[in-house]
């Protein structure tokens, strides 16, 4: 997806900056080498992932640099904030803004979008971003009153505009009701976000050596130590389970 975004931005900015043909060719080849069939499923030896981790990090850094150059070339000078949508269709998006003192964004129609600040940076929920395009917003740094669309009746019951969420005593999703489609998402008796661990003792090799009976011995991770709603704001609700 990063490479597709880079290619799109490079085409859009080609009237201002030259298309980075050599760089994109090198990046594609590096990425495709690391799509080898033993690497993708996690079945290569440990040393392979030490190498690919460094190579992916270097590629991501280069892609980010090229993308930033092209987005900057497409933006008009000014104090606004420009948001790009590289998807092939218009839509609503939750956009990360990083660390910022911006409290809200204002579009050209006068619609105000509140910004929520979290431990992982600021986020804003934007409506109808244009397909493969961008939109510039004015920024507001003064405090904005914005009610949250999320309601907690207690620590284990959350209401959102789209869902009813219920957690059990282990922190598992006991119920997820889809309000728009009027349906229960889980089958009766099933839970969401259940982590199940299986015993893995290879007989001969470190990889590709999975016992046919491995499913007969497993452990469910249900020893909940802490359940805390860390964030409830205009954009998101953040739940932390330990």
Can you describe what each PLM-predicted range is?
Residues 1-18:
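Basic, alpha-helical interaction scaffolds
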Residues 21-25, 33-242:
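Catalytic and substrate-binding regions of extracellular carbohydrate-active enzymes
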